[in-house]
Each structure stands twice: as C-alpha cells, then as structure tokens.
A protein has these predicted regions:
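C-terminal catalytic/substrate-binding lobe primarily of soluble NAD(P)-dependent oxidoreductases
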Residues: 3-275
Length: 275
C-alpha cells in the first residue's frame, strides 16, 4: 500500500533496498504475552510461559541490538563486537535490566525488555545497503519483549537478588486460564506511521490446535516445524540463516498454528507522552 512491490527473489540486496525505500529506521520484534495462571508467582520462584532456564540465560546476557546508520547518540556503556558482520552493538548491562518503549496494536504503548536474540543482528545485517564498500543504510533492530506478568515479577525479584536465579522454576501451561501472545514485527520510520505485523494466538486457540501447549510454545513450535520441513525439502542447502529461508514456504507450513495473522498501522512514537 506504499506503492512498492516486495522482491520476488530471496536476494537480500533487494530486501535491503526495499527497506531503504520505505524509510524504515527501526525494527522492533514487539511481543506482549498476557497469559495468566490461577496460581500466582510465589517467593523464590521464577514463573514463565516457556523455558525458565532459557529466559534467565538470555536475560543475563549483555543487551545486543542491530545499530542503524541514522543513530547519532552513542549509548552509555556500549561497545562493538570484535568479530562478525559489525552490524550490531552491545550494552554492558543485562538485557533483563534494559527497558525499551514499544507498541503493539492490542496492548498499545508498553515498556519491554531488550532481550538478546540473534535476529536483531542477522536482520540488521540482512537489510544493510553498501555503496563502494561503505555502509549507507542499516536499520536499528532489537527485541522489545513484555513477558507474562508473573515473569515480569520474577525478573524484578531476580534483579533484587543480584541476578541470582530463584531456587524454584515453574512453566505455566495447562494451568493458564486466559490470555494470548501477541508476537510481531514493528516497523518505524515510514511517513505513514508505525506498522505492526504478526501473530495473535490465544490460549484457547492454542489448545484447540495442538494439545500440551500454551500460546507461546505453539508459536515457537510452528517456526521449528516449518524450518524442519524446509530442511527436509532442501537437503543440499547447507547451513543457512533463518532470514535466508523462503519465507513464503515457511509461512505456508506454520500458518495453521499461528492464530490470527494481521497487520495494523499506528501513530505511536517512542516520544509519546514524554514531553
């Protein structure tokens, strides 16, 4: 609806140029998990809708984000990696203590956690435009994760313990009573405003689709399934990044398990309400 057609090929150069033409400056992986169980979090317990050990490990890593060419302010305690594609930076603080403002259509504005995820680096690299060996365009990319409410309480408690994990861990699944996972990508910079596109999967939909899942685990499993099927169909492809896999083939496989796939424009900016 901006008068530009997406590339037919998987050539990353074409996708990078499209992102540049759309004036995309920032990309958030914007996720809000509202699932709630009857039994609330207890003291010295970490509660989550997916792997507790995985979330703790990711949250304690230094916050990493793809670093855009439009950025003018160097963050305090930031550094560059001494290896790799040089599309990202890191902050000398845990992602679980790094808050970022973001937006999803149903939640609206929120403060999430800048949790390290590999796609923040690979997407910023994938969408890099170079001219004569010099980087002329690259968006800032990072996660903006607002986990379920009991997981937020768990993070606060762990921070107070000087980042020592609780002795008890509980993954809520069969005891989830309500809520959904709203997981998508927020594009920022286009003159039309922000645009979010992603999956809205309720706990009721997840249980109807595949037993022994909650909304979060099924969204993850759908992507894993699609990747495995693609690998079986392409045995000679070698090692590939997720961004280089045919997205149409992946969505065809994963689509039945993702609930409502939808996109929405908004007029939100990170400066709203901060005057």
């Amino acid at each position: 609806d901006c008068g530009l057609r997406p590339p037919r090929s998987g050539d990353r150069t074409d996708w990078a140029r499209l992102s540049q033409q759309l004036e995309i400056k920032v990309i958030h992986i914007a996720e809000r998990d509202t699932q709630l169980a009857d039994a609330r979090k207890r003291q010295d317990e970490f509660v989550n809708t997916w792997s507790v050990s995985g979330f703790v490990a990711e949250g304690l890593q230094p916050a990493e984000l793809g670093w855009g060419t439009h950025e003018r302010h160097w963050p305090e305690n930031a550094g560059r990696h001494e290896f790799g594609c040089d599309s990202a930076i890191y902050l000398n603080r845990p992602g679980a203590s790094t808050r970022v403002r973001s937006w999803t259509p149903l939640e609206g504005p929120y403060e999430g956690f800048l949790i390290t995820h590999s796609e923040a680096i690979s997407i910023s690299d994938h969408l890099t435009v170079e001219r004569d060996g010099e980087v002329v365009y690259r968006p800032t990319v990072h996660y903006a994760y607002y986990p379920c409410d009991d997981a937020v309480l768990s993070l606060h408690e762990m921070a107070g313990r000087q980042w020592r994990a609780q002795s008890q861990a509980r993954i809520i699944r069969d005891d989830v009573q309500s809520g959904m996972d709203e997981l998508g990508v927020l594009l920022m910079g286009n003159p039309r405003g922000v645009y979010w596109y992603g999956s809205r999967l309720t706990i009721e939909q997840a249980r109807d689709l595949v037993p022994y899942n909650n909304a979060t685990s099924l969204q993850v499993a759908a992507g894993v399934l699609a990747g495995m099927v693609w690998a079986v169909r392409n045995p000679d492809a070698g090692i590939v990044e997720p961004d280089d896999i045919d997205h149409e083939a992946v969505l065809e496989i994963a689509r039945p398990y993702l609930g409502e796939l939808t996109g929405a424009y908004g007029d939100w900016t990170p400066l709203d309400g901060r005057e």
